[in-house]
Amino acid sequence: IGEDRLLPVTVKTYQTAVDKISYEIRSLDAKRLIANADVTSYTENKGMISMELPIQNLLEENEEYLLVIQLESGDRMIYYYTRIIESQNSYVSECIDFVRQFNDTTFDSEKAASLSTYMEKTIGDNTTLQYVTLNNSLNQVSWAEFHGTRLTTPVPSVKEITPTYNVIVLDYVVTWVGQNGQSEYYNVEEYYRVRYTNTRMYLLNFERTMEEIFRGENDSISGNSILLGIRSKDVEYQTNESGKVVTFVQEGELWSYNQEANTLAKVFSFRGYEGVDDRENYGEHDIKIVNIDEAGSIDYI
């Protein structure tokens, strides 16, 4: 919360009519109501609602609180939850600006060399873009031979605020055209641990993970292998007893491959077939495979 005690909030409506907006501030366990109010002043433009929430002078400094934003749409209530904190001299805004600039620079081949001051001893694996840290080469941090573009604007999330450093995570989607001429999409998460001083910013830690959103195109099968693209080595999968049918999870989607029929099928997904939607591509979507029988029927949660 800044000195003006106004919290800017933007909501994507996705063509949902909003009749009323209100908010609550509660203790982190949600048991104690600190403040609540209706939002009467807001603007709506091109499917975006923008508002500023006045935060009353009722918060204890350096204590986290639960903020609940409530939208009324007809007979439905829509809730958004986040945490807020009033902290002096935390320099969160400056750290977010630094993180955004660092991210921008990794995509700019002419400026990428300026990041060398933050690099550490090169001991990381420079053969993959799936996991990149400051221990990789500068070339790897600046995306090596991957000439993709950011499909979505990186969204910063403040995970930790301490007297000595702040932790900020960026989430976004990159895309490029693969060798088969089809668009490929990748979820990217960047973890930054940053220290602010009056003279410079210190990047204490940087980790980037990259996971391909599997599309199941014709070239996804090669011999006895399913080519999942750039992703971690830890694959959630099961096979039936004969090993002829395998089911696996990739970025919140469940897939099944029948080796005898040489068919690959998407069993369950929140995503559509065109583009990437923020709601469908929500990072907390997950699937756990329970069982697969000999006929290829899958139990999952």
Could you tell me what each predicted segment is?
Residues E3-P8, K20-M48, E52-I69, S137-Q182, ...:
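Surface-exposed, charged secondary-structure patches
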Residues E3-Y23, L33, E64-T149, S222-T263, ...:
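Core segments of small alpha/beta cavity-forming domains
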Residues S27, R195, N258-E260:
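Structural recognition of the beta-propeller blade-terminating site
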Residues K46, Q179-Q182, E212-D219, N258-Q259, ...:
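A short, polar/proline- and glycine-enriched secondary-structure boundary/capping micro-motif
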Residues I85, N205-R215:
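Short, solvent-exposed aromatic-acidic interface loops
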Residues S157-V158, Y191-R193, E236, V245-V246:
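Short, surface-exposed charged micro-motifs
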Residues V167-D171, T199-T209:
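Short, well-ordered strand-loop elements centered on a beta-strand within folded domains, enriched
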Residues G181-N205:
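A short, surface-exposed beta-strand/turn
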